[in-house]
């Protein structure tokens, strides 16, 4: 079992907090965001971990070398003109076993990882069906940032679209999922076959949202198992998120 943390982003909505560091090194309760994910993986028994950096790469490299020496580091040199999915495939060579993918701006406990480890499905996606409570703390209008998700018989049928009504949201995608080793060749095939002349939810292939990429997989394989978040978690996307005390 392996893990990849996607940490190439700038985090512009955190304003001056990312002037001298990547978003993943912004602190929540006096600890860098990425340390929460790394500690969760380690506590769950996953030691084969890679991080893909980009913005302020040397700062991230120095932090990992000082605190998590065994982590393998990859670089997305095109971080300014690409998105999360492209960042993930910068570590493609690392993906040769069951692999959990995590965003670097989310905070969760090791129990989330244990649930993904235990799932035998080809693609398992952590989702939060109790998302609204958190979103009400984060936004005056929760629907302004929430995205759609349709779940049928435990499998995700659709996700990642803007919504105007809460009924379109069975749960919220949190940015944490797993590809089983046996399914990785199919994942690579979907990526390699993206139409370079097409736009995916208004983004070109290099900037395709992760939810749009997962949608491409779902449309072809219909195999995305929903794994429900066992407890509170937190996303840090704006400065006010750092004031939320639920984790």
Predicted regions and their residues:
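Conserved alpha/beta core of the MobA/IspD/sugar-nucleotide pyrophosphorylase nucleotidyltransferase superfamily
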Residues: 1, 166-247
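N-terminal nucleotide-binding beta1-loop-alpha1 segment
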Residues: 1-18
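Conserved N-terminal catalytic core of the sugar/cofactor nucleotidyltransferase
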Residues: 2-5, 31-98
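Short catalytic helix/loop segments, enriched in acidic residues and glycine
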Residues: 20-35
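Conserved beta-strand segments of alpha/beta enzyme cores
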Residues: 24, 70-72, 155, 223-225
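Short beta-strand-to-loop acidic/aromatic patch adjacent to the donor-nucleotide binding site
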Residues: 98-107
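Conserved core of the sugar-phosphate nucleotidyltransferase
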Residues: 110-190
């Amino acid at each position: 079992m392996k893990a990849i943390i996607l940490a190439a982003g700038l985090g512009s909505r955190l304003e001056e907090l990312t002037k001298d560091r990547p978003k993943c090194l912004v602190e929540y309760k006096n600890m860098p965001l990425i340390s929460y994910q790394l500690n969760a993986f380690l506590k769950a028994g996953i030691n084969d971990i890679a991080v893909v950096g980009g913005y302020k790469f040397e700062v991230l490299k120095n932090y990992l070398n000082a605190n998590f020496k065994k982590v393998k580091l990859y670089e997305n040199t095109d971080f300014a003109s690409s998105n999360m999915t492209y960042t993930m495939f910068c570590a493609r060579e690392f993906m040769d076993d069951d692999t959990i993918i995590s965003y670097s701006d989310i905070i969760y406990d090791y129990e989330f990882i244990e649930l993904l480890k235990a799932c035998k499905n080809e693609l398992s996606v952590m989702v939060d069906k109790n998302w609204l409570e958190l979103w009400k703390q984060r936004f005056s209008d929760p629907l302004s940032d929430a995205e759609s998700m349709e779940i049928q018989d435990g499998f995700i049928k659709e996700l990642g679209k803007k919504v105007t009504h809460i009924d379109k949201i069975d749960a919220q995608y949190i940015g944490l999922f797993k590809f089983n080793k046996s399914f990785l060749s199919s994942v690579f095939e979907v990526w390699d076959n993206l139409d370079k002349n097409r736009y995916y939810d208004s983004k070109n292939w290099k900037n395709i949202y992760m939810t749009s990429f997962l949608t491409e997989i779902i449309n072809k394989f219909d195999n995305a198992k929903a794994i429900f978040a066992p407890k509170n978690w937190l996303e840090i996307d704006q400065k006010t998120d750092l004031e939320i005390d639920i984790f």
